[in-house]
């Protein structure tokens, strides 16, 4: 994550919103992901340095929350809920069909970089089989 002067200003303004700088970890991870498409090892280092933390502390947050991607994602990112209820309502079949159609596995990206897929947890399983795109 090579930082421009503008990026530094944005990151500093994010940090300044919080009484304790470490509270800015998640917003900074969101910012890094918005720049690079995913959270890179370099962005972990930059965030840790800006917050006076160990890289392991920032990495722990980035790996705990599933919204932070650790590798490249496609231009179109598709998530399919495969929790028990959604699986019963067709989530597994939908996911398997997508994998077969696209020729990729979970967290995979098509060769052209256009589409990536992943398992998600929708928390709305009682309502319908949940699929999300470009979140």
PLM regions and their residue ranges:
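Key DNA-contact positions within bacterial/archaeal DNA-binding proteins
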Residues: 56
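Short beta-strands and strand-loop turn motifs
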Residues: 25-29, 79-81, 130
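Surface-exposed, interaction-prone regions with an acidic/low-complexity signature
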Residues: 1-38, 46-49, 60-68, 93, ...
């Amino acid at each position: 994550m090579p930082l421009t002067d503008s990026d530094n200003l944005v990151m500093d303004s994010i940090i300044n919103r919080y009484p304790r700088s470490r509270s800015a970890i998640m917003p900074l991870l969101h910012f890094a992901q918005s720049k690079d498409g995913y959270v890179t090892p370099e962005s972990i280092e930059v965030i840790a340095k800006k917050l006076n933390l160990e890289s392991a502390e920032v990495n722990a947050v980035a790996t705990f929350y599933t919204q932070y991607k650790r590798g490249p994602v496609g231009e179109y990112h598709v998530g399919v809920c495969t929790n028990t209820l959604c699986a019963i309502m067709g989530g597994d079949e939908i996911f398997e069909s997508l994998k077969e159609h696209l020729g990729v596995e979970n967290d995979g990206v098509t060769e052209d970089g256009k589409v990536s897929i992943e398992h998600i947890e929708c928390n709305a399983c009682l309502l319908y089989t949940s699929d999300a795109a470009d979140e």
